[in-house]
């Protein structure tokens, strides 16, 4: 296929009730478009399934119904989903409709989970991003992803990652991946494509290292390279930023790789660093101190800033929703869109993936991602680390009812720390 025909689109979910001057194509409309045009095959990698709407719109139900109808149209549908102890009614419905499903027991294999979220349609079109197969991801959670159309080369490369998961659904981890599902492109040899007439270099990275087949770039390597290659700025929007690994025994280990690289960029190269971190009722308290630590570096010659992003609550409240779930980074050179939270375990024992895109002219998709970041950074939903929050939506900020003076005050009796893997 002619790579000049490639189309790439940034997608996002803006939770109901939030207002921005400019928004991009919705996750729901993009998924619906992909499903309407799929004619032969659809592969989906997923953390869990909960598309059947509980409140509000029926966007999740619409997507689920469209997937269920695909086998009736002769489309082969394969779903790789993280093995869970809880029954997934949506998945059971998929199986009854003829969808091939494999439960991937990453917990048993590596200790983590299958957290990757991507689609591959007709071996030609792909979607990758933060959105789960959850109705909340279409209306109640702020998400960001990318869809790339008409590129068999990139779709084939992402399929190799899917085949690794599919293999692990019925097999143990092999001694090595030498003869299994090699990558076609990586950080040293990216795929060259044209998007809107502009040459771009693209590759897909995967995590963890144990599942990286021959020539596949590890996601952490891709992320660190993105930071190292920046010469002007690094802007990060992620749900969690915690430089720690949580052990099975409940202990914690310092995991400084990403934080060190950000500090090095700001201090050694005078790169501007901005971190926009999600905050909600389930945020980890330990994250606050790490964010304060890195924010304290800001000085005359070190330009590093941290803000918290709060999605306003719904009325009535909706559990496990109303949070910025995005996982991306944009520099003056590269757009990095991933599926992993920035906590150690997501790179050491949990499955994730990222798309790394560098336009020759520095604009295009990279510029769009920068515009989205700055829109959010400057919005009324972003707060300084020592601000007072008007609501209790953010565990990491004081709120009006907790403090009556201008001095920051922590909770007198902090809530119990929330285990990392209870977060999505």
Curated annotation (Swiss-Prot):
Q: Which family does it belong to?
A: Belongs to the orthopoxvirus OPG042 family.
SMART domains attached to this UniProt entry: PLDc
Induction summary: Expressed in the intermediate phase of the viral replicative cycle.
Q: Which PROSITE patterns match?
A: PLD
List the SUPFAM superfamilies hit by this protein, alphabetically: Phospholipase D/nuclease
Tell me the InterPro entries matching this sequence: Diverse_PLD-related, PLDc_3, PLipase_D/transphosphatidylase
> PLD phosphodiesterase domain location, by residue?
110-137, 320-346
Membrane spanning stretches: none
**What is the protein's species of origin?**
Vaccinia virus (strain Western Reserve) (VACV)
Task: Recall the taxonomic lineage recorded for the source organism.
Answer: Viruses, Varidnaviria, Bamfordvirae, Nucleocytoviricota, Pokkesviricetes
Name-wise, this protein is: Virion nicking-joining enzyme
Superkingdom to which the source organism belongs: Viruses
GO CC list: virion component
Going by the UniProt record, its keywords in alphabetical order are: Endonuclease, Hydrolase, Nuclease, Repeat, Virion
GO MF annotation terms: endonuclease activity
